[in-house]
Amino acid sequence: MLNIFVICTGNSCRRVIGEALLNHLGNGRIKAYSAGSHPIGRINTGALATLNRHNLPPEGYQSQSWKDFEDIPMDIVITVCDNAADETCPVYLSKAIRTHWGVSDPGHVEGSEEEKITAFEETFDLLQLRVQKMLALPLETMLPEELTEKLNTIGKLSLTEGEN
């Protein structure tokens, strides 16, 4: 089983959705964890509501620091925000394959409740597309360089490109 670590700076929205999707769609093939480099101390209620709308359990998520996972050997690290992508990861993550899957922060969307829900749904859909593409790969047997290249390509997919 591969351990996958989803990192975001604030650790309240995107990483929760990413972790939930990886664990749900991974069907025991992978174990996903998530944390933040500078966690804000709470999970965004919009992220939890999005999981609930998709029948994924919203319970058990905490705003955690990446320091809380030092004892778990990570195989793949996925950053989902640009700030986290530019940060230096802790030494314990140095052997992991790193990739960046930039996603706009739905927690920063201003507007009506419908517009906010739409932003979270778009985030969910984009992360779901990328996770599905990743899980279609023979992750366990790929060479690190090949896997890194594929994951980087997946990280550039948009929702419109995923329809092709």
Residue ranges and their predicted role:
Residues 10-12, 82-85:
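Short glycine-rich anion-binding loops that position phosphate/pyrophosphate groups of nucleotides
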Residues 58, 84-88:
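Glycine-rich nucleotide phosphate-binding loop and flanking beta-alpha elements
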Residues 16-18, 44, 87-90, 110:
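Short glycine-/acidic-enriched loop or helix-start segments at secondary-structure transitions
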Residues 1-68:
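Conserved active-site segments centered on acidic
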Residues 33, 76-78, 99-101:
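Hydrophobic/aromatic beta-strand patches that form the interior of the parallel beta-sheet core
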Residues 36, 81, 102-104:
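Residues at the C-termini of beta-strands that transition into short coil/loop
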Residues 88-164:
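Phosphate-binding/catalytic loops
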Residues 71-73:
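Alpha-helix C-terminal capping/helix-to-coil transition sites in glycosyltransferase folds
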